[in-house]
């Protein structure tokens, strides 16, 4: 008897998400918004709508189906169950009730109720919308404190309900406007009420707009009626051409296409001024704002053909780079910010997030991204433009990054509201000793050393391009000393990997974690040790089958559902895979890539979430969702681009002799051929076809030479 063929599996969060710019809606599959859940309509870190419900003759309609249509729109289809009007019972399933919802500036809703019964019906349609104006941080924690006053007023002539929130200098307002309706609206008992008389085979319609009023007091524009499937309006004057992928593996193509859509959907409008200036929000729902680390990681992930993310990140973060010392914001001169917030807690100074600087790695990553961008643009002017910023960043690395002047990078918050951990694993319990106890501050986490090393190597290369050989030699000397120190003090011989770091007493943190893979990515691992590190990271206690866990399953602090102590993060795995590839471990890198694409295939829309559970993979099953994961999320999307570029072996180098795109493919048997069109570099675009180890350039307007082979090492 033949074994049954497994059914296609697609899992995902039990909510519907729509987003555009810094506005988003998270709701139930039936469109409801539950005020006790982490749901609502949010704009600039404030929840403007905390509850929504539709009633027809006092009953909830019966959900038939719902689905996102575009990243900013969804449709909800209902019918009626048992329902009675003044003429008696209605036939079950005789009503079609449709809700279309779009997010763009505000929210636009189209309601259509069609009568397919044999008689006319009289319906009381009630739409309940309530607001709490809660700060996003408190919605996330579930500990909401109302500090200001809420007032609502119905303006009958304007057909709008205005709800205002005021707390000292912080003011927000929601305008609920009836845009058009086939019967006049009323406002009673906290609900919009319509009386609809619908003849057989006729329909009743209304449109509502939710208008959030933030700083400046202007009413935002929403999309017009019936726009759920429309091509999205442009946020910038010139639309960038899509970088297209064709491949023999359809799963990879679907994951790529969704990743590109996610990155497009996460663009922040206030930083998107023109062609080539794009910064993605970090993720929906919790990180719909500018994050230093996230925007820079996405820049690195997508550099092979998507340099506009790096252009936007450097431009915006350079403007926010610290120039003074403010302990409450963990701010020191030269430091790159962690995040910028606009909600009540930030605006009134309750949280120091305007912006907050409590991240260590973003400052090194800023230098690294500039180096990558130069090599992909071939424009020395970009180095001159940002040289003061990267020199200030390096000064921070040397003074503030190394707080005790021992040669290693460490962090310790100085803020009363600061983050305990300030590397990418920034959950409070992320860095534990072997017995599960928290490692005391300050912490010299291992990957920070790799980032600082890479930043020094790359700044030396920048100095070479600017004809400053003395400074280049100085940075290379510093990098060499850090290389030796890391490999002397952080190497863990018994485990064949690196310590997670050193704690505040310089005691090694003997916990096996994914962090060591970032050292391979940074190039700070001696070649003779690389094989042992790769083998340790691929051992069963770290390898789940869907990817490498953040922490060994043998560690007492391991929990497959914990944010940073046992889950699998796609972006973490892509960085580790790129490190494997850098040292020539192509099979192991491809294994991580295959597992990541297998996971994407099993998530809704082939969309990778921020993270998922570290449970062991079993045959014909699926990766388990992490409760509260951001979906879409920028560096989860970016990892798809990074993995494809890694397998294709694409990189760029620019020097005094010219600029070149190097292509050194190591395609696995599950991806024997691919074509990438419209990779952006230099002055134009390049399209490549890779098959059976052969590389064909099908078009090239970049001004770069395409070279078959690996890119030379820097320095």
Model features per residue range: what roles?
Residues 370-385, 456-474, 580-587:
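Inter-helical turn/loop segments and adjacent helix faces that build the functional surface
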Residues 294-325, 515-527, 573-589, 593-596:
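Alpha-helical support elements that line or immediately flank enzyme active sites
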Residues 110-116, 120-122, 369-382, 391-396:
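Hydrophobic or amphipathic alpha-helical targeting/insertion segments
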Residues 1-265, 272-295, 300-311, 315, ...:
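Terminal accessory carbohydrate-recognition/targeting modules of carbohydrate-active enzymes
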Residues 363, 367-370, 449, 456, ...:
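TPR repeat positional signature
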Residues 77-82, 246-290, 315-357, 402-444, ...:
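Extended glycan-interaction surfaces of carbohydrate-active proteins
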